[in-house]
Every structure is written in structure tokens, then in C-alpha cells.
């Protein structure tokens, strides 16, 4: 994975984690106001991700599209808040269920980010093993020269 993809993965992870944290806190008091703040705070990340996803490969672009879809869905909730408040249907099951669905989807994005981090760790371990293998080969060749 190029460094750009890892950087974008980290940006996605930070953005998704911020959204996920805001969704968890939004249940307590006035979830729509906090959701609006989340959307506003994530928009700069989304712009950066859009710029980089045009350059990067398709798997990262798919994650970006999913995140964009979730943000658009959250924006719909923010726009619908005054109407919901007028009708006093804030506690209706279908809206709570929709927010829980978004939260579960954000968890899957966070898992993707962790997988990116794990991939980076695996690449580092492979590099270390390769270095150890070359050093071991040098030591063995040096020992065989000494015996001869």
C-alpha cells in the first residue's frame, strides 16, 4: 500500500471515529444539534478525502463513497429536525432505528481503518523478517568461510 493510501486510511479513521463518537453522545441531549456539529466538523476531512480518492485506487474510493453516503443521510436527519419537533415524533422507533443503522455502518468503516493499520503492521513485520533473513544468510556464509 502506498503511503498516500495509509494517510487517507488514517484520515478516514479519524473522521469515522469522530462521527461515531458524536452519534453515541447524541442520544443523551438534542441529538440533532450534535449531529449538525459533526457534519460541519467532518466536511473538511471529506473534501480532503475526495481530492485524494480521485488519485488513489478503487477500494479506498468505495470507503469514501460509503462515508459520503452516511454523511448525506445524517444531513437529511438534521434537515428533518424542525418538522419532527413540530410533530413531536422525535422518539418514534423508526428514527431511532435509522440512527442505530448509521452507527452500525460507521463501526464497519472503523473496522476497515483498523484493517488498514493491521496491513501496515504486517508489512513492517515482513520487512523485519526479510532483514533478519539476509543477516542470517550473511552470518551463515561468514561461518562457512571460517570453517573452510
Curated annotation (Swiss-Prot):
Alphabetical UniProt keywords: Coiled coil, Hypersensitive response, Membrane, Plant defense, Transmembrane, Transmembrane helix
InterPro entries assigned: Powdery_mildew-R_dom (IPR008808)
Membrane topology: Single-pass membrane protein
Induction description: Expressed in leaves after powdery mildew infection (e.g. Erysiphe cichoracearum UCSC1). Induced in seedlings by the beneficial symbiotic fungus Trichoderma atroviride.
Coiled coil segments of this chain: 120-140
Compartment(s) of residence: Membrane
Domain RPW8 per the UniProt entry, residue ranges: 1-148
GO cellular component terms attached to this protein's record: membrane
GO biological process, one term: innate immune response
Coiled coil as UniProt keyword: yes
Residues passing through the membrane, by range: 7-23
Superkingdom of the organism of origin: Eukaryota
Family per record: Belongs to the plant RPW8 protein family.
Extra remark beyond the main annotation: Ecotypes susceptible to Erysiphe cichoracearum, such as cv. Columbia, are lacking RPW8.1 and RPW8.2 but contain in place HR4.
Free-text function comment from the UniProt entry: Disease resistance (R) protein that induces localized, salicylic acid-dependent defenses. Confers resistance to powdery mildew (e.g. Erysiphe cichoracearum UCSC1).
The protein, known as: Protein RESISTANCE TO POWDERY MILDEW 8.1
UniProt organism field: Arabidopsis thaliana (Mouse-ear cress)
Lineage: Eukaryota, Viridiplantae, Streptophyta, Embryophyta, Tracheophyta
Gene: RPW8.1
